[in-house]
Amino acid sequence: MTYAYTYDVPIDAGIYARIKDGLGPERPPGLIAHLAWSTESGLRYVDVWRSKDDHEAFAENRLHPVVHPILQEMLGFVPPEPTHTVLDVIDAWTDRHPA
């Protein structure tokens, strides 16, 4: 079942670029779409995944090992995971994924 969410993070485009560099170019299994844009307080993301399990595997095995050291370096601590607002997806129409 498609899993999508949005959340805000208090980082700038420079920190985001460091995170993306650390993740490397390989597309995460199950990722349908990822959007990030600037807000007044940092960045906002929208992610769409094939399933919640795909997202959780990526977060635990790939994202957190990259993000946590960067946040520790920049902030002196690792803040709690931001609150995710889960989206009630009706359709995900992309060039790679029929809903």
Segments predicted by a language model, with ranges:
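Short S/T/G/P-rich N-terminal loop/turn motif that feeds into the first structured element of a domain
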Residues: 1-68, 72-99
